[in-house]
Amino acid sequence: MHYINIRMKIRFSIGIMLLTLSTWAQLRINDKAPMQNVEMKSVNGSLYSLSSLKKDKGLIVIFSCNSCPFVVGADDFPGWEKQYDSLYNEALANNIGFVLVNSNEGKRAQADSYEEMIKHAKEQNYTMPYVVDDKAALADAFGARTTPHVYFFDQTFKLIYTGSIDNSWDKGRKSDEPYLFNAIKAQGKGKKIKPNTTEPKGCGIKRVTTTPKN
């Protein structure tokens, strides 16, 4: 019964995500990152901007949280945050910056408060920056849909990959496709990223309003 409930929660999250796909304008490949110099508070107390985190070969931004089964895991899904550390280390090895962004403004008094972010980062041994996106401003500017949702920019802040970390969510997959890991390797070698766009899967970002922004 617990197994069924978890699967129902994940399916419900997918349903909510699909209902909100068209609400926010989406960054597309070759678009430039907005809000490059806006500072956000990290769980270590420091302030970071996208510009300060970008390295010589780019920056990876992953919208994440403390509570979504796609991030933290469930009985039938390990959770993508278990890959964060290895992806972060691979990014560093290829001179690429890396940041986790929590935009769940609608849960700031609950599981995604700043205090809970600090606690979660310690429990999961996060070594990468994990920042608060106040009022989900960055998520809105990016058009971020889900937790997780990946945006990978090159050294000029041009978007070169966006979507999912891999295809492990797909129970019918014929092979494993580590999209983000492959994108990091390709960018590190100066090669073209293929595919450069995949469908993000996860829980919908918990914004405080569903009113579209122009």
What are these regions (language model features)?
Residues E116-D154:
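Short, internal strand/loop/helix patches
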Residues W24-S51, G79-W80:
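N-terminal "domain-start" segment that seeds a small globular fold
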Residues D56-L59, A93-F98, N125-P129, Q155-T156:
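Loop/turn elements at helix/coil->beta-strand transitions in domains of secreted/extracellular proteins
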Residues V71-E123, A137-A139:
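Structural microenvironment flanking redox-active thiols in thiol-disulfide oxidoreductases
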Residues C65-E81, V150, C203-K206:
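Short, thiol/selenol-centered motifs that function as redox-active sites or metal-ligating centers
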Residues M1-R28:
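Bacterial Sec-dependent N-terminal signal peptides
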Residues S49-D76, I184:
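Short active-site neighborhood of thiol/selenol oxidoreductases, capturing the structured segment around
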Residues F152-N214:
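Thiol-/selenol-based redox modules, centered on thioredoxin-like
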